[in-house]
Structures are given as structure tokens and as C-alpha cells.
Swiss-Prot record:
The lineage of its organism: Bacteria, Pseudomonadati, Acidobacteriota, Terriglobia, Terriglobales. Signal peptide: none annotated. Pfam families: CinA (PF02464), MoCF_biosynth (PF00994). InterPro entries: CinA, CinA-like_C, CinA_C, Competence-induced_CinA, MoaB/Mog-like_dom_sf, MoaB/Mog_dom. This is CinA-like protein. Coiled coil: none annotated.
């Protein structure tokens, strides 16, 4: 079955508000084997919303509408769904009584306009809202000659998630054909989306019963594999077979076959070896340390880090010889090597990581352009240095450098 998500609210058509509900709903629908075919954002105009609902009913099996269930004049979702379906609205006395009782229990006075939240579409099942005042509604109807499922959900994310998890998921499980879903998430580092797809497309195109999607973000590729079968064992067998073939093809760049982040993998390998890592960051400004310390239990393997932006701190905290900086410059392979070795020794760690570069937008030259980054990984036996030239703005360069640095450590640990 296919679905459409309609997000209601003029604020989401401005630069100041994002529709995060659709991401959550997509994940939930996919877990049930439902494909999201369309996502639509509609402002608070009755004609536009009615048109969007009618269009959705023509082209999908399930319509999930978020927002527009509040008490104000521009909260029009109930009215628009009723108009699109040719049904009436009835104000539910029990809902009104419950609304006032809840307000009294909280010693809150509510205005009469809140009563419009008790308007129920003919034939709808009421979805209780334990986290807010606006009830949702569920409709399982025949529209034209086809069965359609519609759900009206509140806009605030905490209210929507609670209502969907506790009430819509069981209703959907009963309404949908009984299918088992198997999913796998594979991740690769420092490979372009087009390059990755060129390598694996000949493989996944042979598996027409598996939905394969590629998501790319700043040096990270996520491959989502999803298969629906009558029995879970069948679905898992197919997904695992495809995953195995992709793992073999991407062996040089793949770092996770179960959806872990790169920092989780680095910390896992460190802990398995009983080793520790220390980091000296210049252009990344603490991004690497932040990613590592965001993982619970990272203190077992992460010794510590230093942000050594100035030349003085490179010497003070990482022991870099000032003459080395004077001879080669702060952005050089020699200084990256000294950072990695110095921080490893000063933190008594097994591995040291040093990063220095030019994140821009200024500071570059013909010999050392913006985007030039040197990364080094040091052990007591050997120090490896890598030169990379990234493109993009400051944010992109810094995050790519952090991703490259973590992947460099991962490769040394394998």
C-alpha cells in the first residue's frame, strides 16, 4: 500500500519552521511495509487544503494529515476533510465535557473557541490526545470504489507521536494486509553518492522485491534495504543476501552493516583492542571529540582531546615544536604528524589523532587553498599522514574533515 503525508500550516512554508513530523511518520509507515509516495505541505487556506486532500484520495491508499486541529480560525483540517469527503461535522458533547473537566483539573480556564476541537467527521473514530487538547480522528472508508484510510493528527510532535504510536499503529496493524518486514541499514564513509550507486546498482537492481534507498550526508552514505514478505524468515533471507553482496562490493569503504555510526564503530574497535584514543583538533574545532563523547561509555576508550587553534596552544597542549610551525606552517603534514604524536604521548594513549587545515572562507593561498586538510594517526610504532582537499563552505569542510579523521582511525584499527 502507498500513503501520502499532508502537513498543514502556513508557518512551514516559511524559512523558520520545518516539518519534522513527516520524517517520523515515514519511519513508522515504512516499518509496516507502507511506502510513502508523496509528502505535501499546505498553508492554512481551506480551498488549497481541500484540493490537496482530494488529490491524495485519488492517488494513494492512506492519507495522514498533521496539524490544523487546534481551536483557532485558521485550524481548518476537520472542515476540509469533511468537505473533501462530502460528510458532515457533529460537535461531540462528551468530548466537550471531557475538555472542560481536564481544564478544571489543571485549574485552567479555556475559551469557547476550544469547543471546535470536538467537531467529529461523520463515521470517524476519535483518537484521544493525552498530551494536548485536540483529539485526532481515524476514518476507514470506501471512497469511490476503493478502501481508504485517513488519519487526522495534531501538529505538535509530542502529541502526534504519542497518538500515532498508541492508537494509529494498532489500527493500522489490523487494517493492513499481514506482511512481515525485514530491514537492514548499511553505512559507508568518504565515498560519493554517484560513485557508490555506480558500484552497487548492478547488484540491487537484481532484487526487485527489495526497496533500496541511498542517503548521502557529508562524507557518509546510508543504504536502507527493506523487504516485505508473507513470512519474516523469507524477508530476512532476501535482505541478508543483498546486504552480503553489497558488503562484498563496498568492502573498502563500508564501516557498518547494522546501522551504527562511524564514531560508534571507532569506539567499539578501540574497546575490543583495549586501546585508547586522544585527539588534537585545529580546523575541526572539537567536532571529533564531540562526536565521540556523544556515545555513552566513550570514556572507556577516549582519553581526551584538545582544541589547538592557535600556534601557541599547538605547542603548549600538544608539544608541537614552534620551529616546525615556523618552517612548514600550521597547516602542513609535518604539524599534523606532530599533533598526533604529541597528543598521544601527553595523554598516554595508544592512538593519537591530529587534524589541521584551512576551513575558510579566508586564509587560503595558491599553495594552500581553502579546503586543504592534513590528518595524522599515530601509534608508538608508526604515524600515518593523509592530505585531503575538500570543497564547499566552512561548515562542509569542517564536517568532512571530522568524518575523514574518524574513518582514518577506523582503518588503522581494523
Amino acid at each position: 500500500m502507498i500513503a501520502e503525508i499532508i502537513a498543514v500550516g502556513s508557518e512551514m512554508l516559511t524559512p523558520f519552521r520545518q516539518d519534522t513530523n513527516s520524517l517520523y511518520l515515514t519511519e513508522k509507515f515504512n516499518s509496516l511495509g507502507v511506502t510513502i509516495a508523496f509528502k505535501t505541505i499546505v498553508g492554512d487556506k481551506q480551498r488549497h487544503l481541500v484540493d490537496a486532500i482530494r488529490q491524495a484520495l485519488r492517488r494513494v491508499d492512506i492519507v495522514a494529515i498533521s496539524g490544523g486541529l487546534g481551536p483557532t480560525e485558521d485550524d481548518l483540517t476537520r472542515e476540509c476533510v469533511a468537505e473533501a469527503l462530502g460528510r458532515t461535522l457533529t460537535r461531540d458533547a462528551a468530548l466537550i465535557a471531557n475538555m472542560y473537566a481536564r481544564a478544571a483539573a489543571r485549574r485552567v480556564t479555556i475559551t469557547r473557541n476550544n469547543e471546535k476541537q470536538a467537531d467529529v467527521i461523520d463515521g470517524a473514530v476519535i483518537l484521544e490526545n493525552g498530551r494536548g487538547t485536540a483529539p485526532g480522528q481515524w476514518l476507514d472508508i470506501v471512497h469511490g470504489e476503493h478502501r481508504k484510510l485517513l488519519m487526522l493528527l495534531p501538529g505538535p510532535p509530542s502529541e502526534l507521536k504519542g497518538m500515532f504510536d498508541e492508537q494509529c499503529m494498532p489500527l493500522l496493524a489490523d487494517a493492513l494486509p499481514k506482511r512481515a518486514i525485514a530491514m537492514r541499514v548499511l553505512k559507508a564513509a568518504m565515498i560519493g553518492e554517484s560513485q557508490c550507486d555506480a558500484r552497487i546498482a548492478p547488484i540491487y537492481q537484481q532484487y526487485t522485491d527489495i526497496e533500496t534507498t541511498i542517503l548521502a550526508h557529508l562524507g557518509d552514505i546510508q543504504l536502507n534495504l527493506s523487504c516485505s514478505k508473507p513470512f519474516l524468515a523469507q524477508a530476512r533471507l532476501r535482505v541478508d543476501e543483498l546486504a552480503s553482496r553489497i558488503e562484498e562490493e563496498l568492502d573498502d569503504v563500508l564501516y557498518s552493516s547494522q546501522g551504527e555510526t562511524l564514531e560508534q564503530i571507532v569506539l567499539y574497535y578501540l574497546e575490543m583492542r583495549g586501546a585508547s584514543l586522544a585527539v588534537a583538533e585545529s580546523c575541526t574545532g572539537g567536532l571529533i571529540s564531540e562526536r565521540l563523547t556523544g556515545i555513552p561509555g566513550s570514556s572507556r576508550s577516549f582519553a581526551g582531546g584538545a582544541v589547538v587553534y592557535s600556534n601557541e596552544l599547538k605547542t603548549l597542549l600538544a608539544g608541537v615544536d614552534p620551529e616546525l610551525i615556523g618552517s612548514y606552517g600550521a597547516v602542513s603534514s609535518q604539524v599534523a604528524k606532530a599533533l598526533a604524536e604529541g597528543i598521544r604521548e601527553r595523554c598516554s594513549a595508544h592512538f593519537g589523532l591530529g587534524v589541521t587545515g584551512i576551513a575558510g572562507p579566508g586564509g587560503g593561498s595558491e599553495d594552500k587553498p581553502v579546503g586543504l586538510v592534513y590528518l595524522a594517526v599515530s601509534t608508538p610504532e608508526e604515524t600515518t599522514v593523509l592530505e585531503r582537499r575538500f570543497t564547499g563552505d566552512r561548515h562542509r569542510i569542517r564536517h568532512l574533515a571530522a568524518q575523514q579523521a574518524l574513518d582514518m582511525v577506523r582503518r588503522r584499527l581494523m
